[in-house]
Design a protein with these regions (language model features):
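Amphipathic, Lys/Arg-enriched alpha-helical "gate/interface" segment within cytosolic domains
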Residues: 1-142
């Protein structure tokens, strides 16, 4: 399955990584949800998610849309094994919508946490930190 450039799947880690650039809007979210649902159907095994929103320039969403997507994800994933969804965010608007998503998926197999620190997200997901960093970040750190 060919993924859009902002998405990468690490089969060895059972992890889908989303790195949006530019604007996060309804079209961007819909594209990610479509890929997510396709992978869930194709793989038939649970995988965690990591959303690195630090590269996004702007968030153009609204409460109604976030509620709709969160509730749809909650219902569509009902009865599946638990998965973790880590959201790395610094933007106040993104954090606000991520918290709403976490609240609405509470009690479902989708466990959402929001992080400001990449290492904490890596620890929670139980994956090596370097797998969550971009090539540019690795170059700057090295």
């Amino acid at each position: 399955m060919k993924l859009p450039p902002e998405l990468e799947f690490h089969d060895d880690l059972h992890l889908l990584i989303y790195r949006p650039r530019g604007v996060i809007d309804e079209a961007a979210v819909k594209k990610v949800v479509d890929v997510l649902e396709d992978l869930e159907a194709k793989l038939q095994k649970p995988f965690d998610r990591f959303s690195d929103t630090l590269g996004a320039d702007e968030v153009e969403l609204n409460f109604k849309y976030v509620i709709q997507v969160s509730l749809c994800r909650r219902l569509s994933y009902l009865g599946h094994p638990p998965v973790k969804s880590a959201i790395l965010a610094a933007d106040a608007t993104m954090i606000h919508y991520a918290r709403l998503h976490a609240l609405l998926t509470q009690g479902s197999p989708i466990h959402v946490r929001i992080f400001k620190d990449r290492k904490e997200a890596a620890d929670w997901l139980a994956v090596p930190l370097e797998r969550l960093t971009t090539d540019r970040e690795q170059t700057e750190a090295g």
